């Protein structure tokens, strides 16, 4: 148990650091001052016009996916940024397979017209 003591202490401290800020506002919060204006949607000082839950076109989601693709690519490319003589063949081929999958996905989205604006 003594070899796990630092891990347990770290776990307790990290839980306290993350849970205390969540619990501190509750004793100071009051439910008596709820105004309907505070609960309404804000539209530049005007009364809300229309429903706030309108439908979005699926193209917005496709564009967001296009922006998400480079994030894992960069993240998984960092370990590959070592001198070429330090990478074994498995690491080299696995990175090539990863880049091939990303390239195929990007070509698929391009062919489907995800970046086209109509």
Curated annotation (Swiss-Prot):
Core subunit of the mitochondrial membrane respiratory chain NADH dehydrogenase (Complex I) that is believed to belong to the minimal assembly required for catalysis. Complex I functions in the transfer of electrons from NADH to the respiratory chain. The immediate electron acceptor for the enzyme is believed to be ubiquinone. This is NADH-ubiquinone oxidoreductase chain 3. Pfam families: Oxidored_q4. It is a multi-pass membrane protein. GO terms for cellular component: mitochondrial membrane; NADH dehydrogenase complex. Belongs to the complex I subunit 3 family. The chain crosses the membrane at residues 4-24, 87-107. Its EC number is 7.1.1.2. GO terms for molecular function: NADH dehydrogenase (ubiquinone) activity. Signal peptide: none annotated. Keywords: Electron transport, Membrane, Mitochondrion, NAD, Respiratory chain, Translocase, Transmembrane, Transmembrane helix, Transport, Ubiquinone. It is an enzyme of class 7 (translocase). It catalyses: a ubiquinone + NADH + 5 H(+)(in) = a ubiquinol + NAD(+) + 4 H(+)(out). It is found in: Mitochondrion membrane. Gene3D superfamilies: NADH:ubiquinone/plastoquinone oxidoreductase, chain 3 (1.20.58.1610).
